[in-house]
Amino acid sequence: MFDATTILGYKADGKAVIGGDGQVTFGDTVLKSNATKIRTLYEGKILAGFAGSTADAFNLFDMFEGILAEKRGDLFKSVIGFSKMWRKDKHLRQLEAMMIVLNTEHIFILSGTGDVVEPQDGKIAAIGSGGNYAISAARALDKHANLEPRELVQESLEVAGDLCIYTNKNIKILEL
């Protein structure tokens, strides 16, 4: 289901950064190498990225943007409201997508089952087929290197691109 991408979110030093590769695959075929899987939400104050079904992800983005507007951009309240809505609707629970949403204060993973996970370290999250490679690289770089947040995301996604066949190095990055 998620064999199509790598998305990495990172927040540190008062900054929030999200990045994703550009590869879209269907089975064993690369359909597109320059897709955009990250975007800003709520007047550019929230970053979001998705892995999984593109159609499902765009539905999730739209629904989440509606809740963000309702909660006036409060990310914490929005993810809780989103999860409650998701759990009540059996059709939403069938969506095959995951999202990372973050700002300079919070970072969350929203799963296709309506779960909301705040990473244990509170600053690094990754999803998609190359997510484990990207998060491993990001944790090591966060601990041992003195990189700017944007550089850390770039380098970590490049590691994932080297190792995951469903991830390429056509990386796009957004920053707050």
UniProtKB/Swiss-Prot annotation:
GO terms for biological process: proteolysis involved in protein catabolic process. Pfam families: Proteasome. GO terms for cellular component: HslUV protease complex; proteasome core complex. Na(+) binds at G161, C164, T167. Keywords: Allosteric enzyme, Cytoplasm, Hydrolase, Metal-binding, Protease, Sodium, Threonine protease. The keyword Signal does not apply. The keyword Cytoplasm applies. It comes from the Bacteria. It catalyses: ATP-dependent cleavage of peptide bonds with broad specificity. The active site is at T5. GO terms for molecular function: metal ion binding; threonine-type endopeptidase activity. It is an enzyme of class 3 (hydrolase). A double ring-shaped homohexamer of HslV is capped on each side by a ring-shaped HslU homohexamer. The assembly of the HslU/HslV complex is dependent on binding of ATP. Protease subunit of a proteasome-like degradation complex believed to be a general protein degrading machinery. Belongs to the peptidase T1B family. HslV subfamily. This is ATP-dependent protease subunit HslV. It comes from Sulfurovum sp. (strain NBC37-1). The gene is hslV.
